[in-house]
């Protein structure tokens, strides 16, 4: 039972961490729709960094490059939104739309290959080690975010920011800087999720993120905008994926079942918004 649970957590780790990234951005009222592109770019940055800094240890410098990229891009687009009144959703979508193109071009330039960039055997981590690290990182991310938002002054302010920024302004909090810092955390978490995807495969492949960034946004809503709820939603989603993948063996149209979790996620968002609207209308009477 414990082994199966840890295996599920390890498999869900990239999605779980990406969902935490989405949740942080939701707290500050600036939904990070660029998570999909950040995951893809960071997966490429992580693999490229490991290969290009092999003489310096490879793994740590490569992951550091990816985290800095994810945090930096998120902070940059947030600064544009806060100080220049740019539309952060358009900026996030631009990261998603251009990410795949950048990865393809840079992959060809650096490695002469626009399809699969694999780590050499000497740089590959053992599968069991990757699974252990993935599970540990998922647990630490979820637990750390929950404790941070509950017991630290900055975390509490981040949760308040999206609901009542005027109150924080009134007590002297620099809300613009807090938004940028929080979105940097969101970008770093998205980058960590992207790196895990590439480390679990030991390679960079086209469309590495495969829609996980979008699913993460759904899970942040489906989890009721709470850390525990978001984690449970991510684990449930991966469990359903596994169950459906097992059930579709021998079926004539397996794609219908494979797409069921995505349809379920969309249904949860629509249902939640409908329930909230009906509740507000009922309370208004």
Predicted segments with their positions:
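Hydrophobic core segments of alpha-helical transmembrane domains in multi-pass membrane transport
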Residues: 18-19, 43-47, 100-104, 135-147, ...
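Transmembrane helix-bundle core of multi-pass membrane transporters
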Residues: 88, 92, 99-151, 205-206, ...
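Loop-to-transmembrane alpha-helix initiation sites
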Residues: 89-90, 116-120, 131-136, 179, ...
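Single transmembrane alpha-helix segments in multi-pass membrane proteins
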Residues: 3-57, 63, 68-89, 221-226
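Transmembrane alpha-helical segments in multi-pass inner-membrane proteins
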Residues: 204-262
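Inter-helical junctions in multi-pass inner-membrane proteins, predominant
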Residues: 3-7, 149, 186-218, 251-257
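Cytosolic-side transmembrane-helix boundaries in multi-pass membrane proteins
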Residues: 144-145, 149, 163-177, 244-285
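Helix-loop-helix "hairpin" substructures at the membrane interface of multi-pass membrane proteins
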Residues: 128-204, 227-232
């Amino acid at each position: 039972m414990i082994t199966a649970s840890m295996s599920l957590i390890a498999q869900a780790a990239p999605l779980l961490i990406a969902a935490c990234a989405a949740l942080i951005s939701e707290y500050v009222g600036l939904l990070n729709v660029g998570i999909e592109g950040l995951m893809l770019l960071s997966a490429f940055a992580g693999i490229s960094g490991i290969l290009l800094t092999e003489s310096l240890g490879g793994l740590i410098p490569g992951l550091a490059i990816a985290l800095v990229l994810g945090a930096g891009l998120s902070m940059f687009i947030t600064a544009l939104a806060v100080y220049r009144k740019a539309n952060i959703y358009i900026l996030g979508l631009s990261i998603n739309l251009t990410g795949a193109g950048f990865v393809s071009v840079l992959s060809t330039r650096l490695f002469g290959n626009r399809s699969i960039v694999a780590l050499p055997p000497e740089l590959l981590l053992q599968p069991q080690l990757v699974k252990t690290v993935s599970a540990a990182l998922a647990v630490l991310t979820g637990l750390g975010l929950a404790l941070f938002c509950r017991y630290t002054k900055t975390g509490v302010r981040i949760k308040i920011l999206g609901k009542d920024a005027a109150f924080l302004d009134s007590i002297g909090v620099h809300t613009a800087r807090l938004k940028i810092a929080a979105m940097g955390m969101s970008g770093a978490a998205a980058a960590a999720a992207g790196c895990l995807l590439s480390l679990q495969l030991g390679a960079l492949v086209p469309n590495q993120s495969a829609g996980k960034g979008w699913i993460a946004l759904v899970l942040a809503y489906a989890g009721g905008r709470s850390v525990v709820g978001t984690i449970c939603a991510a684990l449930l989603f991966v469990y359903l994926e596994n169950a459906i993948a097992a059930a579709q063996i021998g079926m004539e149209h397996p794609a219908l079942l494979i797409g069921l979790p995505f349809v379920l996620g969309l249904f949860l968002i629509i249902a939640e918004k409908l329930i909230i609207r009906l509740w507000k209308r009922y309370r208004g009477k």
